[in-house]
A protein has these predicted regions:
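Short, surface-exposed amphipathic charged segments that create phosphate/polyanion-binding patches used
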Residues: 155-163
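Positively charged n-region of N-terminal signal peptides that target proteins for export
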Residues: 1-4
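Bacterial N-terminal signal peptides
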Residues: 8-19
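Sec/Tat signal peptide C-region and signal peptidase I cleavage site
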Residues: 21-25
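Active-site-proximal alpha-helix that buttresses catalytic centers in soluble enzyme cores
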Residues: 27-145, 150-154, 194-202, 207-212, ...
Length: 233
C-alpha cells in the first residue's frame, strides 16, 4: 500500500512525499521539510525504507532520480576550511582505498541489477569525483558546483545548493533511464532530514516543480546481495 507523508510531521514506512516549495531561510536544518504556514514543530525522525526486489524492477523501467553518497573517507584529515581548493585534493577530506573499492562494488551492483543511468551529476569535491570514477568508469559525469558539500557553509551559501538538489530530485526523467546524483549526506540532511551512510543509493520519484518528489527507498551497500538473491528466486 502506498502511504504518502506530509513533509516532516509524521513518520512514513512506505513513500514520503516532499513539496518543491523551499523551507523558510530561518528554519533549522532538521525542519527543512516542515509544513509552511504553521508554527515551528519538531521534525519527526526520518524513516529509512529498505529497497525490495520490486524497487529494482521499477528502476529498470527508468524515470527515477538516484542520490548516491560517496565512499568512505579519512575523517582524520578534514576539509581545509575556508581554504578548500577544488583543484587540489590535498585540501580536502580524502576518499580512502576502502571507500574507492566500495564504490567499485556499488557501481558493479547497479550494472548487475540492469539499472539504466542516463545522467550522472557529480559534486566537484575530490571524494565525489573519485567515487564517480570508481563506480562508473565508462560514464562521463557532469560536474555540478551546486552540489558542493554544505556542512561548512552559511545558510546563504547553502541555499542555491539545496535548491539545486531539490530541482534534481523533482525534475522528471525521460528516455527510459534514471538520473544519478553523486554528492554528500549533509546536503540531503538539509533537504529532507536524512543522513545516508557512505555508498547508499537513495531512490526518489520526481513529480515536477510544483509537486516535488517522493522518497521511495534506500539501498545501503550491504543490501545488494539480498536483492540479487530475491531476484533469482
Amino acid at each position: 500500500m502506498k502511504t504518502t507523508c506530509a513533509f516532516a510531521l509524521i513518520e512514513c514506512f512506505a513513500v514520503m512525499a516532499f513539496s518543491a516549495t523551499p523551507a523558510l531561510a530561518d528554519d533549522p536544518p532538521s525542519a527543512a521539510v516542515a509544513l509552511q504556514g504553521l508554527a515551528p514543530v519538531a521534525a519527526a525522525k526520518f524513516a529509512e525504507v529498505a529497497a525490495t526486489i520490486d524497487t529494482l524492477r521499477l528502476l529498470r523501467t527508468g524515470g527515477y532520480t538516484l542520490y548516491l553518497r560517496h565512499g568512505n573517507t579519512d575523517n582524520t584529515i578534514p576539509d581545509r576550511v575556508p581554504a578548500v581548493d577544488l583543484n587540489d585534493c590535498s585540501t580536502q577530506r580524502p576518499l580512502t582505498e576502502a571507500g574507492r573499492q566500495l564504490m567499485v562494488k556499488v557501481g558493479d551492483a547497479i550494472r548487475k541489477a540492469h539499472i539504466p543511468i542516463g545522467e550522472l551529476k557529480v559534486s566537484p569535491m575530490c571524494r565525489a569525483r573519485e567515487s564517480a570514477a570508481a563506480a562508473f568508469p565508462k560514464l562521463s559525469p557532469e560536474i555540478d558546483h551546486n552540489l558542493m558539500y554544505v556542512a561548512n557553509f552559511t545558510d546563504g551559501e547553502k541555499a542555491p545548493i539545496i535548491a539545486n538538489t531539490r530541482r534534481l530530485l523533482s525534475t522528471p526523467v525521460t528516455g527510459g533511464s534514471n538520473r544519478l546524483v553523486l554528492a554528500h549526506a549533509p546536503n540531503l540532511m538539509e533537504l529532507i532530514g536524512y543522513f545516508p551512510k557512505e555508498g547508499t543509493l537513495v531512490v526518489f520519484s520526481p513529480r515536477g516543480a510544483k509537486l516535488g518528489f517522493d522518497y521511495i527507498a534506500s539501498i545501503p551497500p550491504a543490501l545488494w546481495g539480498d536483492l540479487f538473491h530475491q531476484d533469482h528466486k
